[in-house]
């Protein structure tokens, strides 16, 4: 049986209305199985958003995330775990594909999240590049609903993680039409490789498939996840909060490390 031709338009309209009224931002965060401190990098992003008074939901569909239970298909909101006043967490490994449509898009998953967590200002969708392509592709009908999506790519200062990050950036650019990205790089403050890695990713992605590294931030995996973010990470967050949440209050207690381990 064929699907109604207007289904994509209805879905896109619903997403646009949701964004317009709730000011919710969906931020694709590319998971990387070759990094040992992915949870720390996610924590630092949450801290940076909280410093700007934004409430964050982490939708964790990464390779090491827990699987969503059957209740997620019945009442997704009941599966969201509050970690602090500013951060909530949803284990979502394997969940998005349950919302796939006939065109291969899982954009409906984003709409369901928006309905389940209307109080969230930021939704960090942590997943593999292929999953993010299905959710955020600009080549699918209704792409205008996520036209500002700019993936955050996670990596560390060793070859395997950088190679994986490069492949993910290429996939997002070619399959999803998302060539612009930010990089959050886990590296010690004294690492001599961090700057070179960012520079090489910028030049190689530009040369081979037109990728654009908009900004990057170094995050010390051994640092305190609740410390205020540095200027580099704050810039990456600010890109996603243009026009809102400009104030930066005093340090906030959002310790939630156990959930991201």
Where do the protein language model's features map onto the residues?
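Extended, low-complexity, amphipathic alpha-helical coiled-coil/linker regions that act as scaffolds
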Residues: 42-45, 67-71, 187-190
